[in-house]
From Swiss-Prot:
Listed name of the protein: dITP/XTP pyrophosphatase
The record's free-text note on cofactor binding: Binds 1 Mg(2+) ion per subunit.
Function: Pyrophosphatase that catalyzes the hydrolysis of nucleoside triphosphates to their monophosphate derivatives, with a high preference for the non-canonical purine nucleotides XTP (xanthosine triphosphate), dITP (deoxyinosine triphosphate) and ITP. Seems to function as a house-cleaning enzyme that removes non-canonical purine nucleotides from the nucleotide pool, thus preventing their incorporation into DNA/RNA and avoiding chromosomal lesions.
GO terms for biological process, alphabetical: nucleotide metabolic process; purine nucleoside triphosphate catabolic process
Record's keyword annotation contains Transferase: no
Species per Swiss-Prot/TrEMBL record: Dictyoglomus thermophilum (strain ATCC 35947 / DSM 3960 / H-6-12)
Keyword Iron: no
Length: 205
């Protein structure tokens, strides 16, 4: 049977690159909304968890396109800020760029000592096939610290201030191939890939 298209429900180019690299085996099947010429705004993330927000996006795109969908939601949780930024990471600080968001985080933490700067990236990935009534959710988490200043221009989002002790670098300083061995998104989508492998062998997609 012909392989079915799987839609990637994100407009974040950084996330698109990472997900396609992690799921490279399915690169011919996974299509972005732009590639499929669906000019749509994704729905407002009104959920109270990463899982809920990811599924809100997946369900919305599935209903419009009719295709199986992959979506995700992720965030940065900082202990010293009582778990912020969490599900509001992308909206933190309002409609400003990530340089400004990073500056706001560092300002909030200017008096926080190193031992209290623990943080983690969380990712929840969703595969949703509306026609087959299949919904799979996987997750990934990576622990680190909030650096005192941004370092590196690789990656995207909050990567330049997320210090990863194992490599003694921020995520903004490491190559994408290296990041894709350890990141929260890699962990979540590696688990999702195991499901896709079995699902495809079953002839579903």
């Amino acid at each position: 049977m012909d392989k079915r298209i799987i839609v990637l429900a994100t407009k974040n180019e950084g996330k698109v690159r990472e997900i396609l690299e992690i799921l490279s085996e399915y690169k011919d099947q996974i299509k972005t909304l732009k590639e499929l010429e669906f000019d749509m705004d994704l729905p407002e993330e009104t959920g109270k968890s990463y899982e809920e927000n990811a599924f809100i996006k997946a369900k919305y795109v599935a209903e419009i396109t009719g295709y199986p969908v992959i979506a995700e939601d992720s965030g940065l949780e900082i202990d010293a800020l009582q778990g912020e930024l969490g599900i509001y990471s992308a909206r933190f600080g309002g409609n400003v760029g990530y340089k400004e968001k990073i500056s706001l985080v560092l300002e909030k933490m200017k008096d926080t000592p190193w031992e209290d700067r623990k943080a983690r990236f969380i990712c929840k990935a969703v595969f949703y096939d509306m026609k087959e009534d299949v919904k799979i959710i996987t997750g990934g988490k990576v622990e680190g610290y909030i650096a005192y200043e941004p370092k590196g221009e690789k990656g995207f989002g909050y990567d330049p201030i997320f210090y990863f002790p194992l490599l003694d670098k921020t995520f903004g300083e490491i190559d994408k191939s290296e990041k894709n061995k350890y990141s929260h998104r890699f962990l979540a989508f590696s688990k999702l890939k195991l499901f896709l492998d079995a699902y495809c062998k079953g002839g579903k997609i």
